[in-house]
Amino acid sequence: MEKGILKVELEHPDHINTCNLSHDHSWITIYVGSGVTLANSELELALGDLIVEDLDFVDSEFEMALGDVDFTGTLHGRCKFDVALGDVRMALNGSRSDYRIEAENAMGSLGIGGAYYDQKMANSWKDTSGTHHLKVENAMGDTDIQFR
């Protein structure tokens, strides 16, 4: 696909999905439906947004040159977000086992925790159990991290 918008919807609650996607030329928006678990997934986007609502992530990585990441869900294991331009918004919910988060953002805003941009992101980061590691690199823009 060389022009236009590619919309990817994953809505299979009873399955664990592996999603490996590389896209270079046109804008891509990925919507991931609720009740889905993505395991060992990797998304590399040159242009586009990643919009995730109510999803379980297991050892996943997202690399984006331009675009926004809007994430609401539960993390298990290692999760890496690497965004060169654009905003990263993460609202984490539910009880989790050990997890590792790396968020690197060269330009734009980085928000992790409760309602940062939008009141609809009312979930809060609740540190319930396990060992947690958070690495944040933000060269330009605002960084907001909330622990409750």
Model-derived regions: residue spans:
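Short, surface-exposed interaction patches in beta-rich subdomains
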Residues: 71-148
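Right-handed parallel beta-helix
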Residues: 1-72, 122-148
